[in-house]
Amino acid sequence: MDKYDVIKAIGQGAFGKAYLAKGKSDSKHCVIKEINFEKMPIQEKEASKKEVILLEKMKHPNIVAFFNSFQENGRLFIVMEYCDGGDLMKRINRQRGVLFSEDQILGWFVQISLGLKHIHDRKILHRDIKAQNIFLSKNGMVAKLGDFGIARVLNNSMELARTCIGTPYYLSPEICQNKPYNNKTDIWSLGCVLYELCTLKHPFEGNNLQQLVLKICQAHFAPISPGFSRELHSLISQLFQVSPRDRPSINSILKRPFLENLIPKYLTPEVIQEEFSHMLICRAGAPASRHAGKVVQKCKIQKVRFQGKCPPRSRISVPIKRNAILHRNEWRPPAGAQKARSIKMIERPKIAAVCGHYDYYYAQLDMLRRRAHKPSYHPIPQENTGVEDYGQETRHGPSPSQWPAEYLQRKFEAQQYKLKVEKQLGLRPSSAEPNYNQRQELRSNGEEPRFQELPFRKNEMKEQEYWKQLEEIRQQYHNDMKEIRKKMGREPEENSKISHKTYLVKKSNLPVHQDASEGEAPVQMEFRSCCPGWSAMARSWLTATSASQDIEKDLKQMRLQNTKESKNPEQKYKAKKGVKFEINLDKCISDENILQEEEAMDIPNETLTFEDGMKFKEYECVKEHGDYTDKAFEKLHCPEAGFSTQTVAAVGNRRQWDGGAPQTLLQMMAVADITSTCPTGPDSESVLSVSRQEGKTKDPYSPVLILM
């Protein structure tokens, strides 16, 4: 650390910190990553050392450069290039919702893809590609891939790792499902970074880890803006394929025209030639093999393509199968033609050398041929003899006597296993059956027993057992219901003396009472039996059944009445609104009886509805006010009149009908003391005036005065 001046801390991780420093000798800015070994487990120590080794190998314009590494006081220091633009996530957050242009997105994506191609070509998985591990420099124009802390070196590019590592938002479906993965996992993470550049947000988000994993495994994401090109839409959909086999490789991504045209903008011709030289190996090797002829050139091109597409195991199996068939079906020519074959055998290693490591496979094939066949001649693969050789395989195949003992043993075991399975399925009788020997004799005589009848018999037996179980269930249910009825008293107790005999029940000819309804008509029957003592038992049974029927009828009637009342509750609580009465006008009603009935009648004792109660209260109030007004009127106008209680009651009940004969005006006039009603002389006026004055003094309200 004496060679650097630490300026400030720019980051902190689980086991260390990152500082911005400046070299004392050259005054260049750099990043020093400090890792504390004391608190770190062994696996993390190995990962840190691995990062140092990887960074030393990585030299690419789009990968963060490695300067130096050293250890001091149990700490590891890694000196790396400083990117003044920060990481890509900070750049995305500074946009504040404003989308990047498509040119800017494609420029960054091509540079990230070039850096990823560099490490994939060296059989390294990054396994933590995310926006925080992509750094910008030169005012954000150059993107570089960094932080190889959890990268893994693979022995082969198709080797599958099983460790679940990575940031949750960038995890691939195979990691979430704990399945093997390879470099296609980095392709999924690369698609997540591209989606963030297009939308400024994560492609897969959830409230919890379980919801996030579910969306990742189903590849459910919102589409990007329709303002982007169709090629960009198609690329994102291909990067987010759930199956790793359906995702493109990094080389096929960079071969797309709209991305391939941008590569010269960020790499020099020398770097382009170095990075893409392995793709031109087949073109460079073609002129060297022209002396071998057209057939050799075709064979070489096919093998080079085969080498790039298929895994190593399939490369071994295909040539062995083909050459084994050719060797077994070989046609042996005369001795004079063997020299040409020896010449061809000498030329073949040259072809294999052109095709890469196929010389090792051909050597293994030759060794296998020499072991199987001792003659020293070697077969020559011919282009037009493949179909003929395959046809000769069936003709000149080895006889059964020449089959190896291991094959015969396996065949015997397979037959025994087949026989055992047939016995278990019922297709073949078991040796434990009593008539097994008879079946064997029939089979030896050519009479094959009917094994197909056995499944039908088994089905019939199963069906019988099924019906038997149903009968048991029915009987059990019948017994349970019988016990329940006994407890409820509906069924009489069984008499031990009753024997199971046949009884004849007939209706009686006795007349039925008219008062009884149809449902309540008594049932009278006559019994006949085939055994003595039937009458007592029949009578007891009849009485019990009739009693139970009466109870059931009563209960049924009560239930019907309750249902009617529940459906129409107004009928149950409906008040009587009218009383029907009859008046006999012929009879003479005395006043005394009427007064006694009025005294016995008490209005509050009657059953009143709510409306009648309110009217009764109003009537009481009016009556009280009427009494007060009558008393006041008596005091003011006629205190000496001396109305009796009977007249006051008559005034109060003025609107009611009296029970006696009506006292009309004519009767009152008949009682009055009047000498004549019609005046006959001139003195009549004086007589009338005198009578008026007398009437005024006697009673001002008399009917005579009213008529006057």
UniProtKB/Swiss-Prot annotation:
Cofactor: Mg(2+)
Swiss-Prot/TrEMBL keywords: ATP-binding, Cell projection, Cilium, Flagellum, Kinase, Magnesium, Metal-binding, Nucleotide-binding, Serine/threonine-protein kinase, Transferase
Gene: NEK5
Primary location: other
UniProt xrefs under CDD domains: STKc_Nek5
Annotated family: Belongs to the protein kinase superfamily. NEK Ser/Thr protein kinase family. NIMA subfamily.
Membrane-spanning residues: none
Compartments it resides in: Cell projection, Cilium; Cell projection, Cilium, Flagellum
EC number per UniProt: 2.7.11.1
GO molecular function, one term: ATP binding
A Gene Ontology cellular-component term: sperm flagellum
Catalytic activity: L-seryl-[protein] + ATP = O-phospho-L-seryl-[protein] + ADP + H(+); L-threonyl-[protein] + ATP = O-phospho-L-threonyl-[protein] + ADP + H(+)
Biased segments, Basic and acidic residues type: 440-454
Residue sites binding ATP per the record: I10, G11, Q12, G13, A14, F15, G16, K17, A18, K33
Location of the Protein kinase domain: 4-259
Region entry Disordered, spans: 376-403, 423-454
Protein name according to UniProt: Serine/threonine-protein kinase Nek5
Residues annotated as the enzyme's active site: D128 (proton acceptor)
